[in-house]
Amino acid sequence: ASFGRYSNPATWGWENWFMDYGKSGGCITDLHVHDIDIARYLFGEPKSVSCRAVDTNTRYDIVQTVLEYDGLPVMAEGAWSSGQMKFSSCYRVDFEKASVVFEDGKVTVYPDRDPAPYTPKLEGWDGYTNEIAFFSDVVSGKITNERNPASSAAQTIRVIERMKASADAAGKPQCI
């Protein structure tokens, strides 16, 4: 599996908040964290992480991570790089009988055999709108957040901290 998010440096935040590493945590904590979170959601807790990073604007602005799951490497990449780059995200996950790819805002399923590759209908699907609606329902008390409890978010941040330790050690794997 591989995941990626790319953007120009987030200079549009209030008082340049995103570019202040002490406030935002940089790309590794603000952008890359989403792919680490979904990897944990899909595959569970990694055994170890290895991370390489480049500092361009703040700290850890271009990040490449390998999460190790009992011999299965899951890769993730995140970058605040070129000032001209528009935001994009992508993923590829290989399952037992198909691969699923998300790129250019479209999901495509590639079965091992028949049928031919196809794009599933995802009516009413918009990640941002659904995320905001879910958050609003939790905050208003309409639903209980069992999908992504605070303990899971905290564990993702612990993984990010191990990734920083790995990046600071030139990619040396760190146990989780």
Regions inferred by a protein language model and the residue ranges of each:
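Predominantly a Rossmann-like dinucleotide-binding segment in NAD(P)-dependent oxidoreductases
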Residues: 1-52, 170
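Active-site rim elements
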Residues: 25-27, 119-122, 143-147
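A generic "alpha-helical surface" signal
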Residues: 29-30, 126, 151-155
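A general structural signal for well-ordered alpha-helical segments in protein cores
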Residues: 35-36, 128-136, 157-160
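Conserved glycosyltransferase catalytic-site signature
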Residues: 36, 59-63, 150, 157-160
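Phosphate/oxyanion-binding loops and surfaces in catalytic or ligand/nucleic-acid-binding neighborhoods
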Residues: 45, 49, 96-100, 160-166
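NAD(P)-dinucleotide binding in Rossmann-like oxidoreductases
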Residues: 53-133
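C-terminal helix-rich "cap/oligomerization" subdomain common to oxidoreductases
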Residues: 70, 136-176
